[in-house]
């Protein structure tokens, strides 16, 4: 019998891991126990290849109430409010079944947040697909977007932002990362723990079926060979968002009692994962009878009950004698529930089948899988790509056409085709929705602290401050960011850039970054080059989080994003949370009024590595990721926040994909009036013109200021030693004009002016708007 036919390999274990199981138990595991170890020691559940590296991330900070290890991280906003948030992937299921994979990804991240005792108030998403000119990729995009919209809209949680990229590296593995934000009281955090021998273990939510069995161990913990997608269709669960809504309301009401000891979402690996993790955290055991689990299918085996990933289910540890209260609340909301077991004091997960013991395993053994330290090797491609000679690339003859092509790229253009399928105004708390630098919600618009938890509050009402009096309206800004091309070219720096840009996107709205969650999407960690990339990315993430003061509160690692041996670009997505102390100072990117002065903060270098311009116009992905000075990044962000809150800035926008010319165009596109345009000039040195226009140098922010305030702004920038240039003015003619100034012959103070771009803003709007619809609506 070959190893692939051995029982352990059929559940995803290696022979060495199987031998360790035998050593732990002191005997051969029976089939049910083997299934239990198979899922709990899978990469998806155990993080066995990533755990050692993740320990290097900074996880402590003045705002952090709950760091990694729980269903979601929690940060304090003030004495009355905290935010729970989490970012997680549903990549493999979404490639197999785009609609259901994406929908259940939203459902899972919502449960992760409301399990903590928080009411979900916003979601974001980070999506990756192959090129849109391929029918398969358009099919994936349609299915994923429809699934996200169906689930989120039905539950009634607004989608306030996100990002999407299209690149050849995601052709065989799309990425679907979902983020959720919830509001709770700082003293009302609920955790996934079982405690108190004799306390009841209850399952709350939908009945259990066979859907999703082994999805964690065999779908999300292995790479595709190209044929698995069709064969694995039955492993993707189907979600019910209305049931999720009822489950959420029931759980939030349960939290207003003191009957709940602990609660855990039954997500990946289902009942066995939630029960063993709760027991291990509490240092106790649990005894479960699978025949007491409400089932929707006949003849289910014990291991099927344990591994089912049927959606919309929770496992709850309830104080002994309080079961009837839980049942009454569940009945009120039309949610099923049943007592299926009890907490024990022996540290064992004991599984019964109608009273007969069918499995008995130490809870800690299931929860503490082997930790590996894979071999590392720097990829050979890096040296070749970094040696690329940029002088080989000709500069465009038509700068107007080049700008329009970039604005029409699906990686830069408007995402309205996507986010218009999502409800971003439900709950009446959205201040800035999708399409800007970051999403922003108003605290107090939908929920506020009550005597026992969270209660409804009319839109627009302020929240009490520390003094108990109404203060300035507060908000939460959030963004998700990662440029996989940067990480491909320089994993350490590219990941640091992802953290910096996620923070910068919040800062330009006026919000101060406080913490991150992450979703690390990589290929097969057993390949030394892939693991080297992952390890470098974690180093870059740690360095950036330390420099910017944004600790990591949790996240997710998704390995094995490969098909036929071809891995995705490494994509460590960052979800950033920032606090807006005064929404009256909220800043948006669009030009506001004629005569405002346009300034560029930060320095532009001759950098084209990883840029959208190089890839789209020249078909080149080469060079190095843009340079990043984290100390300067922190200073820049602090100064911009100060300028915004002192009322010195009328608009602010991060310079990112597409570079300076695209960022300026985006400010014109988002202008308060369609008649607004701009007249700007850039100074040329010895570098390339395209590098000045479309290079993606980091730590740059565009701002506008009134003529009355621009002097104060310039003085602040000079005192804080922030380099800046006055580029020009907002105009009233509805045109976008960009000229280059080059040193003339003779005097150093004489400049030769060359008009590079002169276009109606309406043309920019049209190109930007049609970037995705021209493919999807063709």
From Swiss-Prot:
Pfam families xref list: AIRS, AIRS_C, FGAR-AT_linker
Molecular function as annotated in GO: ATP binding; magnesium ion binding; phosphoribosylformylglycinamidine synthase activity
Subunit structure: Monomer. Part of the FGAM synthase complex composed of 1 PurL, 1 PurQ and 2 PurS subunits.
Catalytic activity: N(2)-formyl-N(1)-(5-phospho-beta-D-ribosyl)glycinamide + L-glutamine + ATP + H2O = 2-formamido-N(1)-(5-O-phospho-beta-D-ribosyl)acetamidine + L-glutamate + ADP + phosphate + H(+)
Top EC class for this record: ligase
Positions annotated to bind ATP: 47, 86, 518, 555
Keyword RNA-binding: no
InterPro entries hit by this protein: PRibForGlyAmidine_synth_PurL, PurL_linker, PurM-like_C_dom, PurM-like_C_sf, PurM-like_N, PurM-like_N_sf
Binding site for Mg(2+) 2: 112, 265
PANTHER family: PHOSPHORIBOSYLFORMYLGLYCINAMIDINE SYNTHASE SUBUNIT PURL
Originating organism: Symbiobacterium thermophilum (strain DSM 24528 / JCM 14929 / IAM 14863 / T)
Chain sites annotated for binding substrate: 89-92, 111, 309-311, 558
Annotated residues for binding of Mg(2+) 1: 88, 556
Coarse class of the protein's main subcellular location: cytoplasm
UniProt keyword Cell inner membrane present: no
Gene this protein is translated from: purL
Single Gene Ontology BP annotation: 'de novo' IMP biosynthetic process
Domain of life: Bacteria
Protein name from the UniProt record: Phosphoribosylformylglycinamidine synthase subunit PurL
Keywords linked to the UniProt accession: ATP-binding, Cytoplasm, Ligase, Magnesium, Metal-binding, Nucleotide-binding, Purine biosynthesis
GO terms for cellular component: cytoplasm
């Amino acid at each position: 019998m070959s190893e692939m036919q051995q029982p352990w390999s059929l559940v995803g274990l290696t022979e060495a891991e199987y031998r360790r199981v035998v050593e732990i138990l002191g005997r051969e595991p029976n089939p049910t126990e083997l299934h239990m170890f198979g899922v709990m020691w899978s990469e998806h559940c155990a993080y066995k290849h990533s755990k050692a590296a993740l320990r290097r991330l900074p996880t402590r900070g003045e705002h952090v109430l709950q760091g990694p290890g729980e269903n979601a991280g929690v940060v304090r906003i003030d004495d009355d409010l905290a935010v729970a948030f989490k970012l997680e992937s549903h990549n493999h299921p979404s490639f197999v079944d785009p609609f259901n994979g994406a929908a259940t990804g939203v459902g899972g991240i919502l449960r992760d947040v409301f399990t903590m005792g928080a009411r979900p108030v916003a979601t974001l998403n980070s999506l990756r697909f192959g090129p849109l000119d391929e029918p398969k990729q358009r099919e994936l995009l349609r299915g994923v977007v429809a699934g996200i919209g169906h689930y989120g809209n039905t539950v009634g949680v607004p989608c306030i932002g996100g990002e999407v990229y299209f690149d050849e590296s995601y052709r065989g593995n799309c990425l679907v990362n979902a983020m959720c934000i919830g509001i709770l009281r700082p003293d009302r955090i609920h955790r996934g723990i079982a405690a108190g021998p004799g306390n009841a273990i209850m399952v709350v939510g939908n009945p259990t079926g066979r859907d999703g069995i082994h999805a964690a161990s065999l779908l999300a913990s292995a790479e595709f060979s190209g044929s698995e997608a069709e064969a694995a269709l039955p492993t993707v669960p189907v979600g019910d968002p209305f049931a999720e809504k009822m489950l959420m309301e029931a759980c939030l009401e349960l939290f207003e009692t003191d009957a709940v000891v602990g609660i855990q979402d039954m997500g990946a690996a289902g009942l066995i994962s939630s029960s063993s993790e709760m027991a291990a955290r509490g240092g106790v055991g649990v005894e479960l009878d699978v025949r007491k689990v409400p089932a929707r299918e006949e003849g289910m085996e014990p291991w099927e009950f344990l591994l089912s990933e049927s959606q919309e289910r929770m496992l709850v540890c309830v104080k002994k004698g309080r079961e009837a209260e839980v049942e009454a609340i569940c009945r009120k909301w039309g949610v099923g529930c049943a007592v299926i077991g009890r907490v024990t004091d022996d540290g064992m997960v004991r599984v019964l089948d109608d009273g007969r013991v069918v499995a008995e395993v130490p809870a800690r053994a299931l929860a503490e899988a082997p930790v590996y330290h894979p071999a590392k090797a720097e990829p050979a491609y890096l040296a070749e790509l970094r040696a690329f000679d940029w002088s080989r690339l000709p500069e465009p003859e038509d700068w107007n056409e080049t700008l329009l092509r970039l604005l029409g790229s699906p990686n830069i253009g408007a995402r309205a085709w996507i986010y218009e399928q999502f409800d971003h105004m439900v709950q009446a708390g959205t201040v800035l929705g999708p399409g800007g630098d970051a999403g922003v919600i108003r605290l107090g618009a939908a929920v506020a602290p009550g005597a026992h938890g969270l209660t409804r509050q009319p839109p627009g009402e302020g929240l009490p401050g520390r003094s108990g009096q109404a203060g300035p309206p507060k908000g939460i800004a959030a963004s998700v960011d990662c440029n996989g091309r940067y990480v491909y070219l320089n994993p350490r720096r590219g990941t640091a850039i992802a953290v910096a840009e996620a923070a910068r996107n919040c800062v330009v709205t006026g919000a101060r970054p406080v913490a991150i969650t992450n979703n690390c999407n990589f290929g097969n960690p057993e390949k030394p080059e892939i693991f080297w990339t992952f390890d470098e990315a974690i180093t870059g993430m740690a360095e950036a989080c330390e420099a910017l003061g944004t600790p990591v509160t949790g996240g997710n690692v998704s390995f094995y994003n490969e098909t036929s041996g071809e891995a995705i670009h490494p994509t460590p997505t960052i979800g950033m949370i920032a606090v807006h102390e005064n929404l009256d100072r909220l800043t948006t990117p669009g030009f506001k009024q004629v005569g405002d002065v346009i300034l560029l903060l930060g320095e532009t270098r001759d950098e084209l590595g990883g840029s959208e311009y190089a890839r789209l116009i020249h078909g080149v992905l080469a060079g190095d990721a843009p340079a990043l000075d984290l100390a300067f990044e922190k200073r820049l962000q602090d100064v911009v926040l100060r300028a915004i809150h002192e009322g010195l800035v009328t608009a602010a926008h991060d310079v990112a994909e597409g570079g300076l010319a695209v960022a300026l165009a985006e400010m014109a596109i988002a202008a308060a009036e369609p008649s607004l345009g701009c007249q700007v000039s850039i100074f040329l040195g010895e570098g390339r013109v395209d590098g000045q226009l479309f290079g993606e140098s980091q730590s740059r922010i565009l701002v506008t200021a009134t003529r009355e305030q621009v002097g104060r702004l310039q003085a602040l920038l000079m005192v804080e030693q922030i380099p800046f240039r006055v580029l020009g003015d907002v105009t009233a003619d509805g045109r976008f004009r960009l000229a280059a100034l080059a040193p003339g012959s003779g005097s150093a103070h004489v400049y030769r002016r060359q008009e590079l771009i002169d276009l109606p803003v309406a043309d920019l709007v049209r190109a930007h708007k049609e970037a995705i619809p021209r493919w999807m609506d063709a």
